[in-house]
Amino acid sequence: MIHVRRHETRRNSKSHVPEQKSRVDWRRTKRSSISQLLDSDEELDSEEFDSDEELDSDESFENDEELDSNKGPDCNKTPGSERELNLSKIQSEGNDSKCLINSGNGSTYEEETNKIKHRNIDLQDQEKHLSQEDNDLNKQTGQIIEDDQEKHLSQEDNDLNKQTGQIIEDDLEEEDIKRGKRKRLSSVMCDSDESDDSDILVRKVGVKRPRRVVEDEGSSVEMEQKTPEKTLAAQKREKLQKLKELSKQRSRQRRSSGRDFEDSEKESCPSSDEVDEEEEEDNYESDEDGDDYIIDDFVVQDEEGDEENKNQQGEKLTTSQLKLVKQNSLYSFSDHYTHFERVVKALLINALDESFLGTLYDGTRQKSYAKDMLTSLHYLDNRFVQPRLESLVSRSRWKEQYKERVENYSNVSIHLKNPENCSCQACGLHRYCKYSVHLSGELYNTRTMQIDNFMSHDKQVFTVGRICASRTRIYHKLKHFKFKLYQECCTIAMTEEVEDEQVKETVERIFRRSKENGWIKEKYGQLEEYLNFADYFQEEKFEL
C-alpha cells in the first residue's frame, strides 16, 4: 500500500483556522508618517489607487483559492457580493484613516477629513459607475442569452418544419401512387419533370395489379390516342358480329318462308350455315375499313341494326315457345273445337286400328299429325275434364269407395224410389234419400280405350240423396265422355268401312261426312254442356 500524504487545506482541517492578514496593519506600515500624507495630495491619491488595486488583486486571489477549495455552492457568487466586499474594505480604510487623523495634529485633521470626504464621493461615483456597468453587462448577457435561445429555437423549428415538410411530401407522393387514377397522372408527371434526379416515374400498386411505368408526356398522349382507336375497332367488331347474326336469321327466314315450320327445321342443314359464314367472312375482309357494312345486298346502319336484332330476338323467343308448346302437350294456342276435332279423328283411327292410341301414348309415332293428336288428347283429359272432376269431388263428402265405383263402371242409371230417412251411401250423411244409383258396364283403359272383360256383368246399387244423385250424374258423364265418344266412333266406322280401302282414306271420308252432317258439332256442344253443369253446380245443402 502506498500512502499518499495530503496537504492540509481549509476543507481538510476544520480545527486549524489560519489567521488572516490584517489589512489595517499593512496600511499602517505603508503610511509611516502622517507628514508624508500632508505633502502632496497627488501622492496620496496615487498610493491609494495602488493600494486599491493591490487589495482587489489580493481579494481576487483569495476568492479564487476559496472557489478551488470549496467546489460547492460558493462557486455561484455574483458581482454584487464583490461590491459588498469592496465597500467593507473602504469603510475599514476610513476607520483606519480616522484613527490616524486623531493621532495627528488638528490642522492636518481637517485637511484629512476633507480629503476623506472627497474620496468617499469619488468612491460613491465609482460604485454608481460600476453598478451601471454591471447592469449593462447583465442586460447584454441577458440579451445575448435570449438571442442564442431564439436562434436555437428557430433552428429547431426550421428543422422540424423541414422534417414535417419532407414527411408530408412523402405521404402525398405515396397517396398519389396508391390512387393510380388517370386524373392524377398529370400532377405526378409534373413532379417527375421538375426533379433532376429521376427521369422515370414508377407507380407502386397492389400485389395483383401490374406495375405502371410512365416515361414522358408524349407517351401518355400516345396512349390516349391509342385507346380511342382500340374502342373504335372493338365497336366495329361488335357491329360486324351483330350483322352476321342478322344475315343468318334473314337467310333462314328466306329459306323457311314457303314451308311449314317443322319441315323447315328438319330440312335445314349445317352446310348452308357454313357457306353463309364463309361468304360473310369474305364480306368482312372486303368492308373492314368502311363505316357502313354491306352484307347480303343490304345496308344496315347502327341504330337500324340494333332494332332489327331486337326484333329477331323476339321472333326467336316466339318460335322457341311454340316449340315448347308442341313438345309439352299441356299447352297449346289452338281453340277448343280444333282440339275436339283432332280427338275425334284419333278415335276414328283407333276404331279401325286398335293399336293406334297405344303407339301414340308410348311415343312410337313421331310425325307432326300424331303429335298434334296427342296434344289434343292431353288437352281434353287434363284441361277440360280433370279440373271439373276435382272441383266436384272437393266440394262434396263422397267416400273414396263410392268415387272409385263411379269411375270404374262405364254405365250409370239413376231412378226415383220410395223416400227413406237414412244415411246417404255416397257421403255418409243422414238424409231423406229418394234416389237409387245403378252402376254397370265394362272396365276399360282410359288411354288406349281397351276393354277389360273381367266381371263385365257386375252391377252396383247405392241409395243416395238428391244432391249426391245429381252430382253423380254430372261426374259420370264427364268421366266417361271420351269412352262414350269412342264407342260411337266405333259404330260409325263399322258402318262406313269399305273393303280394300286404306285406313287414312277411310278416316278422312268418315271425318268429312261427320263434319258435314253436324255430328262433331253436336258432340262438342254436349261436352260444353257437361262442363257448364260442373262449373255452376250448387253447393250441397242439408234437407230438413
From Swiss-Prot:
Q: What are the Basic residues biased-composition ranges?
A: 1-14
Modified residue annotations for Phosphoserine = 88, 131, 154, 195, 219, 329
Q: Keyword annotations for this protein? A: Coiled coil, Phosphoprotein
GO cellular component terms given for this protein? nucleus
Q: Which domain of life is it from?
A: Eukaryota
Task: Please list the coiled coil stretches.
Answer: 229-256
**Phosphothreonine modification, residue list:** 227
Q: Where is the composition biased (Acidic residues)?
A: 39-67, 273-294
**Residue ranges under compositional bias (Basic and acidic residues)?**
16-27, 112-132, 223-248
List the protein's name. Coiled-coil domain-containing protein 82
The answer to whether UniProt assigns keyword Phosphoprotein to this entry is yes
Q: Where is this region: Disordered?
A: 1-294
Q: Name one Pfam family in it.
A: DUF4196
Compositional bias segments (type: Polar residues): 88-108
